[in-house]
Amino acid sequence: MDWKLELVPIPVADVERAKAFYKDKVGFHLDHDVRNGELRVVQLTPHGSACSIVIGKGIIDTPPGSVQRLHLVVPDIHAARAELVERGVEVTEVQDLGGGITMAFFDDPDGNSWALQHIAPGAGRPPQS
């Protein structure tokens, strides 16, 4: 049986501000924006990802800014960082963690933190026998 992670809730204080950040600055695709009384569900997906995030009202009780270090795996960390910086996102410099792993970090307006991650081809894989 396949089990697929497809939706990760992100707690935010201001849905419109967060929606604009993820759509316009980070470049996520807006999949849905549904309102039903007190419930609001905004689903956004990173380009090329099978997993989406959801922000809104009435969907999560976790305090805004409490999600830490969600990873966006990218094929070219320098290009990904440059794209975010060009869009106005404050991103750390790329850090070489050794073993072929590089990362850069940014926060959304509520303080939820994200990591751009690149692992060089073959890094961390056990030797073939």
Residues of each region from the PLM?
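Eukaryotic phosphotyrosine signaling hubs
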Residues: 5-7, 65-70
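Short, charged/polar surface micro-motifs in flexible loops or helix N-caps
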Residues: 47-52, 60-62, 77-79
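Short amphipathic alpha-helices within nucleic acid-binding modules
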Residues: 21, 78-83
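Core segments of cupin and vicinal oxygen chelate
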Residues: 2-3, 9-51, 86
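Vicinal oxygen chelate
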Residues: 1, 7, 31-34, 40, ...
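Short, charged/polar, Gly/Pro-enriched secondary-structure boundary elements
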Residues: 49-53, 111-114
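Helix N-cap motif at beta-to-alpha junctions
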Residues: 14-15, 75-78
